Amino acid sequence: MSRFNLCALLFAGALGLVRPGAVWATAPQAIPEIVINVDDQELKVLKEGQEVAKFPISTSKFGIGDDFRSYKTPTGVFQVCAKTGENLPVGAVLKGGRFTGEVLPPNAPGRDPIVTRMIRLKGLEAQNRHTLARGIFIHGTPEERRIGKPVSWGCIRMRSRDVVELYKQVPVGTRVVICGTGRHGFGSWVAKLWS
């Protein structure tokens, strides 16, 4: 078991996502899985249990949670339920799931719209049941200089080139696990304890 998977398992237990005595299957998976570590601001793609890609991200500046109007990043188990932006140019501004015709360069000043691609998430647990209604996405941002810090309004932000790559790798139906305590850097600290 990789350190990252162990970290995810520890956080899941700490957050009450794992019942005492639960058995975790370690069999390889046929489709990819996304694991997002809020503490390390990192997204990993796993295929057949092996890490195939890793990207820096940005989650909510308000911490973790799922309440309406909280602007927090929800945690737990999710599923990719829709994808938007196929074949759009990098920096394409998306509003209401539609291309506006505007294209922004990285780090364009003044605004922070959703750009390039949108990967919509649906919560699969009671603790994240509002995710779909809240409009929580994995998406591109023009504020690329801020990636790696928790600065979003609840969504998972990525650099445009990274979200294009992720979009190609994950189909609708992909399982997504978002874990962490909401304390930036805590995941690395726990991983070091186990090394």
Q: Where in the sequence are the language-model features?
A:
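Positively charged n-region of N-terminal signal peptides that target proteins for export
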Residues: 1-4
